[in-house]
Design a protein with these regions (language model features):
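Conserved positions within tandem-repeat grammars
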Residues: 18-20, 83, 113, 125-127, ...
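Acidic, turn/loop-rich segments in luminal/extracellular domains of secretory-pathway
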Residues: 11-59, 126-172
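Extracellular interdomain linkers/hinges and stalk-like, low-complexity segments
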Residues: 1, 44-45, 52-107, 157, ...
Length: 201
């Protein structure tokens, strides 16, 4: 009947992944996903129709959910020893062909970007790598790297994670490089007559 919904399950027949509803006037069945991360087949909805003569006919409706994996491009920056660097990996929503039409699942800008702690796997806002420096991520995915004063070379970098509107994650690395700075000096030479005090810099 109108307004009623029936649970829709994953292929295992146990895990709820959405609901079915039917328009009694047209017989059109609508599948509404509730588990946005699920992809694959959904258990079919059995639909029974009856004509004016009372003849019943049964059919099934089987939706299939095609995955759309978001993509990410890593970022690299280079600066001199001691300088704070910022870099931003680029994230794009995933696309999939559905019935000959390209569909995109956009990135979710309401969920802040995080760094992945390589030791624990936890998602964090700030991370210190011993002997290297401290990384901090802004909600939009911009990473700030504050190197330790003596650190030079290519850093191990960090993994940045964002998700699309279905909650599907995408990861990319940010790798800063620190160029060494060697202080330079110019020899000072002065000349004066014998017995005079001289200064040089």
């Amino acid at each position: 009947s109108a307004g009623q919904t029936t649970p829709a399950y994953a292929e295992d027949g146990v895990t709820p992944v959405g609901t079915y509803s039917i328009d009694p006037a047209t017989g059109e069945v609508t599948f509404t996903p509730t588990e946005k991360s699920y992809t694959g087949k959904v258990t079919p909805a059995n639909v029974q129709a009856e004509d004016t003569n009372g003849t019943k006919v049964s059919t099934t409706y089987t939706p299939s959910i095609i995955p759309a994996q978001p993509e990410a491009e890593p970022a690299k920056t280079v600066d001199v020893q001691g300088a704070t660097q910022t870099g931003k990996p680029e994230f794009q929503g995933g696309t999939a062909m559905v019935n000959g039409e390209e569909k995109t699942v956009e990135m979710d800008d309401t969920v802040p970007a995080k760094l992945v702690d390589p030791k624990t796997g936890d998602k964090v806002d700030s991370l210190t790598v011993e002997g290297e420096g401290t990384y901090t991520v802004a909600p939009d995915g911009t990473v700030t790297f504050k190197p330790e004063p003596k650190f030079t070379g290519v850093a191990k970098g960090v993994e940045v994670v964002r998700q699309d509107k279905n909650g599907t994650p995408a990861k990319a690395t940010y790798t800063p490089e620190v160029k060494p700075v060697t202080p330079t000096g110019t020899d000072a030479v002065t000349e004066d007559v014998q017995g005079s005090t001289q200064t040089g810099k």
